[in-house]
Amino acid sequence: MKTTISGKLLNGRLAVLGAGKIGGILLRAFLEQKLVQPKRVHATVRHAEKARSLAKQLGIQASTDNRAAVHGADIILLAVKPQAVKEVLEEIKPEMKPGKLIVSVVASVSTQLMEKQLGMDLPVVRAMPNTPCAIGCGMTGLAKGIHAGKDHLEIARAKGRSAQAFGGCCHPRRGVFAGLLVWDESPKARW
């Protein structure tokens, strides 16, 4: 029997902005684990040819139009390159409405910076998966922004854990998250 959160995930609309490497891995895991129906997904990539290929391969809607992807979405998985975040957030800002949740897997961009860029009280959760997450064996640190509540954090955690895409999940207290990122981004520290 599905929990309320799992039901929300299955029945919600998901936009994946940046369905390349990590965004693509997570999207495939969500679809394989049936956490979201393909007809409820709109993923974006930079090139139209890649969008057509992705749509055909996964049975989802795919395009190069971030604003169109976000329009009907309940959950937005932000998986673009760090240098593209400002431009993408500016592009989708007109479509952002109360009730939407942003889950970001973008490295080096804090929830505070995203909230400031959006200029509205929207929940943002940062999920920082490490490399072994590509095979479901990693660890993901979660940090909620100022407007995100425990329910938003739980949605992000449930989505990742259920898909086994995030490996294990942890929600370190404020101040410890930065240390987790340093550890994750330093391969020598793990070995």
Regions found by a protein language model. Give the residues of each.
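NAD(P)+-binding Rossmann beta1-loop-alpha1 motif at the extreme N-terminus of oxidoreductases
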Residues: 1-64, 68-71
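Short coil/turn residues that cap or connect secondary-structure elements
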Residues: 18, 77-84, 184-187
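Mobile beta-alpha loop/short-helix "lid" or hinge segments that flank ligand
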Residues: 19, 122, 126-134, 164-178
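Rossmann-like NAD(P)(H) cofactor-binding subdomain of soluble oxidoreductases
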Residues: 26, 48-49, 58, 66-71, ...
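Residue-level recognition of oxygen-bearing side chains
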Residues: 68, 176, 186
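Internal alpha-helical scaffold of NAD(P)-dependent oxidoreductase catalytic cores
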Residues: 113-123, 139-173, 185-191
